[in-house]
Amino acid sequence: DSSTSRGLGDVYKRQVLQRVSDVRFVMAGSGDLMNHVVRRVAQLGIADRFHFTGFLKGGEVQRMFRLSDVYVMPSVSEPFGISPLEAMRSGVPVIISRQSGVAEVLDYAIKVNYWDVDALADAIYGLLTYPALGRMFASKGLEEVTGLKWTNAAAKIKTVYETVVAEANN
C-alpha cells in the first residue's frame, strides 16, 4: 500500500506502520521542511518505508495518484490546497486537516484535526484496512470534485463565515 503525504508528523506515521505492515509513505514536493522530514525518518529507523520524490509535474503527479491508495494532507497552513482535489479527481480517497481551507468545501474527504495524530493514524488505518470504505470515499469524492464549481465553493465558505459571525454575536 502507498500513502501520499504532505506536512509534518512522525507519530502518526509510526502508528500506521505499527498497525499496517505493508504501508509505504510517498512524500512529494520540495520545501523548507523536506530536509527535516528526511532526517527525522532516518532517525526513527523507518526510512525504508518512505520514498521522497521531490517536485512532481504534469504526468508524474497523475502517475503517483494512480499508484496511491490514500492521499494525506495534514497541513495546518494550506489556505486552499489544490492537491486534494487532484487526488479526488484521480479516484484516491483523501484525508485532510480540518484547519486547511479546502476542508470547508469538501464533504467526501476524511477530516481530522491537525494536532490529533491518533485520529489521523486511525483514518489512514481505516482506509487501508477496509477497502469498501476507501472505494466509497474514492467514488463519492470523484463525483464531488467533478461537480465542484467555484461559485458553489464560495457559497459554502460564505455560509461558514456567516455562521461564525452569528455565533459570535450571540
Language-model-derived ranges and their functions:
Residues H36-L56:
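Nucleotide-activated donor-binding/catalytic signature segment of Leloir-type glycosyltransferases, i.e.
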Residues A132-E162:
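A charged, aromatic-enriched C-terminal amphipathic alpha-helix characteristic of glycosyltransferases
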Residues A109-D118, G126-P131:
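Conserved acidic donor-binding segment of nucleotide-sugar-dependent glycosyltransferases
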Residues P93-I96:
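Short hydrophobic beta-strand element within catalytic cores of glycosyltransferases
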Residues F55-L56, R63-S68:
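Short alpha-helical donor nucleotide-sugar binding micro-motif in glycosyltransferases
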Residues V76:
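Aromatic "clamp/platform" in nucleotide-sugar-dependent glycosyltransferases that forms part
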Residues D1-Y12:
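Single conserved hydrophobic/aromatic residue that forms the stacking wall/gate
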